[in-house]
Amino acid sequence: MSKLFFVAFLCLIISVFATTPDEIGCTDISQAEFDEKNANCIKCGEEGFGEEMVKRCRNKCFTDNFYQSCVDQLNGVYEEKDTPPVKE
């Protein structure tokens, strides 16, 4: 289990160092804005969601709903949208 964790953590670290806006196709975003949004994605990955979370969070230059879900999760206001309402 520790080997699997190490590999996942290593992949996450590599993905952190290998990103600029141009590398993921975001040509209309400043480096400062990219760094801020990318840091949010990395935090989501570190929360136990892994490298796939980071990739999906960066999808479509952070304009995908997945990025907003990540930010909501970090802020503690995430609400599952696909679950049916609870009947009392």
Curated annotation (Swiss-Prot):
UniProt miscellaneous comment: Co-purifies with alpha-latrotoxin.
What is the superkingdom listed in this entry's lineage? Answer: Eukaryota
Instruction: Tell me if Magnesium is a UniProt keyword of this record.
Output: no
What is this protein's record name? Alpha-latrotoxin associated low molecular weight protein
Sorted alphabetically, the keyword list is: Secreted, Signal
Q: Which family does it belong to?
A: Belongs to the arthropod CHH/MIH/GIH/VIH hormone family.
In which tissues is this gene expressed? Expressed by the venom gland.
Outline what the protein does: May increase the toxicity of alpha-latrotoxin and/or other venom components. Is non-toxic to mice and to the cockroach Periplaneta americana.
- Where does it reside? Secreted
| Source organism per UniProt | Latrodectus hesperus (Western black widow spider)
Output a single Gene Ontology CC term carried by this record: extracellular region
Query: Where is the signal peptide, in residue numbers?
Result: 1-18
